[in-house]
């Protein structure tokens, strides 16, 4: 699902989801723990929960 999410970012934002968000905050990318840092990180957290 992570690769699909990256493809969605590529199509919507016009930038590489992996390179821009692969290591962003606590939840964007592989794994995740702690409290989301901001709205973007919260979006990744919500995606991880589905």
UniProtKB/Swiss-Prot annotation:
Top class in the EC scheme: hydrolase
Cofactor needs: Ca(2+)
Keyword set includes Isomerase: no
Coiled coil: none
EC code: 3.1.1.4
Catalytic reaction annotation: a 1,2-diacyl-sn-glycero-3-phosphocholine + H2O = a 1-acyl-sn-glycero-3-phosphocholine + a fatty acid + H(+)
GO cellular component: extracellular region
Keyword Cytoplasm assigned: no
Binding site for Ca(2+): 27, 29, 31, 48
InterPro entries: PLipase_A2, PLipase_A2_dom, PLipase_A2_dom_sf, PLipase_A2_His_AS
Primary localization: secreted
Any GO molecular function: phospholipase A2 activity
Top-level taxonomic group: Eukaryota
Gene3D superfamilies: Phospholipase A2 domain
Single GO BP term: arachidonate secretion
Tissue specificity remark: Expressed by the venom gland.
Cysteines engaged in disulfide bonds, as pairs: 28-44
Cofactor binding description: Binds 1 Ca(2+) ion.
Subcellular locations according to the entry: Secreted
Subunit structure: Monomer.
UniProt similarity note: Belongs to the phospholipase A2 family. Group II subfamily. D49 sub-subfamily.
Function: Snake venom phospholipase A2 (PLA2) that displays a potent enzymatic activity as measured by indirect hemolysis of red blood cells. Is neither lethal when injected into mice nor does it present anticoagulant activity. Displays a moderate inhibitory activity on the aggregation of platelets induced by low levels of ADP, thrombin and arachidonate. In contrast, strongly inhibits platelet aggregation induced by high doses of collagen. Shows myotoxic activity, increases the plasma creatine-kinase activity and induces edema and myonecrosis of mouse skeletal muscles.
Protein known as: Acidic phospholipase A2 1
The species this protein was found in: Lachesis muta muta (Bushmaster)
């Amino acid at each position: 699902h992570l690769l699909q999410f990256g493809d969605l970012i590529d199509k919507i934002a016009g930038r590489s989801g992996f390179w821009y968000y692969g290591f962003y905050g606590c939840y964007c990318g592989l794994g995740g723990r702690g409290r989301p840092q901001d709205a973007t990180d919260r979006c990744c957290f919500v995606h991880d929960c589905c």
